[in-house]
Amino acid sequence: MHTMTPLLKKQQAGEKLVMLTAYDYPSAKLAEAGHVDLLLVGDSLGNVILGYDSTIAVTVDDMVHHAKAVRRGAPATFMVVDMPFASYHGSFDRTLEAAARIFQESGADALKLEGAGDILTTIRRLTEAGMPCVAHLGLTPQSVGVLEGFKVQGKSLAAAEQLIADSLAAEQAGAKMLVLECVPHPLAKRVQELLTIPVIGIGAGADVAGQVLVYHDILTYGVGRLPKFVKAYADWNTSGTEAIARYVEDVKNGTFPELAHSFLMDEELIGALYGGFKE
């Protein structure tokens, strides 16, 4: 298990923290090779891996399955795992069972929970039970129906003040980090100024401790239109489609496989296959 200490030292030294989502073994290996500071096994896997319209259908089983693969691919990187929709609502006993399963079976270093209010009490109790937690405020995708779509949060004074209050309460509840999603840059900056824990932004501007983006978004891999806050660093949609098309063409026209891609046999054995006669 990894601790927050190296990450906090980087924050204190003024070094930005870099978080990236990962959902399987190869994405985790690439992320660790690229020297990201943290990995997030997000319930966004429901969208980008499983093809769901939202994260609502993602289960604890899904999170455990994918997080175990990520841990195998990136054993040296701090890994945060989302608690999926409805797994931390209702009785605390049920929440504890789900959290403990994810934590134990996946090798998670921290669990991420969306929302404020009663969720902060859950964060406090899980922390007391020995499971570090990350809070997630602003746009919370599991509650997007209540929030009336994917919209910037905290745009009014009242909403901004509530977000600040919730952020302070999250730190007081024991959250080790705070993810702020889709909030105005100046508001995110003010939140980071008021907190001692790292604020990791996604669509929250540059004046926070670090940034998180989705693996498939920065690589333009299997995704469509990108959100405003995403910067693409590759175009795997185009390069991947072109590569597959070339493979199809080579097989169809007989140029693949070539002799270099094939395994040979001794001529006598070949003759034996043809009853001793090779035409």
From Swiss-Prot:
EC number: 2.1.2.11
Organism domain of life: Bacteria
Cellular component GO terms held in the UniProt record: cytoplasm
Residues annotated for 3-methyl-2-oxobutanoate binding in this entry: D43, S44, D82, K112
Sorted UniProt keywords: Cytoplasm, Magnesium, Metal-binding, Pantothenate biosynthesis, Transferase
GO molecular function: 3-methyl-2-oxobutanoate hydroxymethyltransferase activity; magnesium ion binding
Record has Magnesium as a keyword: yes
Gene Ontology biological process terms, A to Z: pantothenate biosynthetic process
Keyword DNA-binding: no
Name of the protein in question: 3-methyl-2-oxobutanoate hydroxymethyltransferase
